Swiss-Prot record:
Role, per record: Involved in protein export. Acts as a chaperone by maintaining the newly synthesized protein in an open conformation. Functions as a peptidyl-prolyl cis-trans isomerase.
One GO BP annotation of this record: 'de novo' cotranslational protein folding
HAMAP family assigned: Trigger_factor_Tig (MF_00303)
Organism this protein belongs to: Thioalkalivibrio sulfidiphilus (strain HL-EbGR7)
Protein's name according to its UniProt entry: Trigger factor
Keyword annotations: Cell cycle, Cell division, Chaperone, Cytoplasm, Isomerase, Rotamase
Residues in PPIase FKBP-type domain copies: 161-246
């Protein structure tokens, strides 16, 4: 077999492969002889069909079958011979087959770019350092209390935090509209679940009060017939209820499934959960910095096939999140290209780092990661058994751990500094430009 390779561009290769006719002819002959021993043709005893008859009836089909298989196998052999790794499927153009001549074709494909790992000593990483305090636990307990709040009817004017039970009947230019009417609807003032203009005008109303209010709809309101319009609502307050929070006692702890240990056990569980959240957030923050640094330090020319494949994966993920309510054409390639380029680049960079540094996945870390993940579930053993009995899930976990090892390696090579911060600063970072 003869192979020649032409460099079309930095990443594109055109490989010409010539397969001797003997390879095809010998395989065709072998299959026809095997067929002659098994085939049944009228007028001939089983196993006694002349090879010439078998060739006349089945020769063309067997020939095409062999040519297809030889093309595929010779393509793989040629790649190994030339030490080429294609990125994506090739475009194959076979030359017309002539009697007595071998198979010849060209395969055009992109190859993976050569990745040269940059000097990582200047990679700056800021590692948050967080201790979960008693005050942090108190805040979470208070949030849990609010989640268990109950509303009790009061005979006074409604104020922020109250729940108002209201009837309303809306109209636009004197005409009723879809969704504009409700009875005994609970509206919690300050939650923002209703239009602000509607909610604000419930403040100060008492049980039994009635009035008609104007409510302007924003320009970006989903319903076309209401965008930018002002509707009138006749409203009547049935009840005003104020929130009451449960006491933090043994009964409160039991409401979260804690049968023994009471409030102290609840606080222990809350702290343990917060510390797991901190560990995950710390890892995510460091990883994000490392990935940004690696991407910036390794500008790559990428095979378009890989980028397109990643774009399609991202598009399918987006479509599944919308549950089929959005059409694929609403997500053009441009929406995902930047993220696809980043992901493909980082995949190639990490692959080269792992190969060049001889990294192997740490089985101990895989075990520890699995146990940490399982600890957050009601039945940790069920989670552990699932991963151990599911090869695909296990492989995904191992890939994640290996990526974590890469992050640790980069941090060790670079310049890492510790930054003390509170639990709230870590878990609820303020966006740049946020108002004081």
């Amino acid at each position: 077999m003869q192979v020649s390779v032409e460099t079309v561009s930095n990443l594109q290769r055109r490989m010409t492969v010539q397969v001797p006719s003997e390879r095809i002819e010998q395989e065709v002959d072998r299959r026809l002889k095997s067929l002659a021993r098994r085939v049944k043709i009228d007028g001939f005893r089983p196993g006694k069909v002349p090879l010439k008859v078998v060739q006349q009836r089945y020769g063309a089909g067997v020939f095409q079958e062999v040519v297809g298989e030889v093309l595929q196998s010779s393509y793989q052999e040629a790649l190994l011979q030339e030490k080429l790794e294609p990125a994506g499927s090739p475009s194959i153009e076979p030359k017309p087959l002539e009697p007595g001549k071998g198979l010849e074709y060209t395969a055009t494909f992109d190859v993976f770019p050569k990745v040269e790992i940059a000097d990582l000593s200047d990679v700056a990483v800021e590692r948050p350092r967080v201790e979960v305090s008693d005050a942090d636990v108190d805040k979470v307990i208070e949030t849990l209390r609010r989640q268990r709040k109950e509303f009790v009817a009061v005979d006074r004017a409604a104020q922020k935090g109250d729940q108002v039970i209201v009837d309303f009947d809306g109209s636009l230019d004197g005409e009723a509209f879809e969704g504009g009417k409700g009875e005994a609807m609970p509206v919690e003032l300050g939650e923002g679940r209703m239009l602000a203009a509607f909610e604000d005008q419930l403040n100060g109303m008492k049980p039994g009060d009635e009035k008609t209010i104007d409510v302007p709809f924003p320009e970006d309101y989903p319903a076309e017939n209401l965008k930018g319009k002002t509707a009138q609502f006749a409203i009547k307050v049935r009840e005003v209820k104020e929130p009451t929070l449960p006491e933090v006692d043994e009964a409160f702890a039991k409401s979260f499934g804690i049968e023994e240990g009471g409030v102290e056990k609840l606080r222990e569980d809350v702290r343990a959960n917060m510390e797991r959240e901190v560990a995950q957030a710390l890892k995510a923050k460091v990883k994000d910095q490392v990935m940004q640094a690696l991407f910036k330090a390794h500008p790559l020319e990428l095979p378009e096939a890989l980028v397109k494949d990643e774009i399609e994966r991202l598009r399918q993920q987006a479509l599944s999140r919308f549950g089929g309510q959005v059409k694929p054409e609403n997500f053009p390639d441009e929406v995902f290209r930047e993220e696809a380029v980043r992901r493909v680049s980082l995949g190639l960079i990490i692959r080269e780092l792992v190969a060049s540094k001889g990294m192997k996945v740490d089985a101990g870390r895989v075990k520890a990661e699995l146990e940490a993940m399982a600890a957050g579930y009601e039945d940790p053993r069920q989670v552990i058994d699932y991963y151990r009995n599911n090869r695909q899930a296990q492989s995904g976990l191992e890939a994640m751990v290996l990526e974590d090892q890469v992050v640790d390696f980069v941090v060790e090579q670079g310049k890492a500094t510790d930054k003390p911060m509170s639990f709230d600063e870590l878990m609820n970072p303020r966006k740049e430009g946020a108002s004081e």
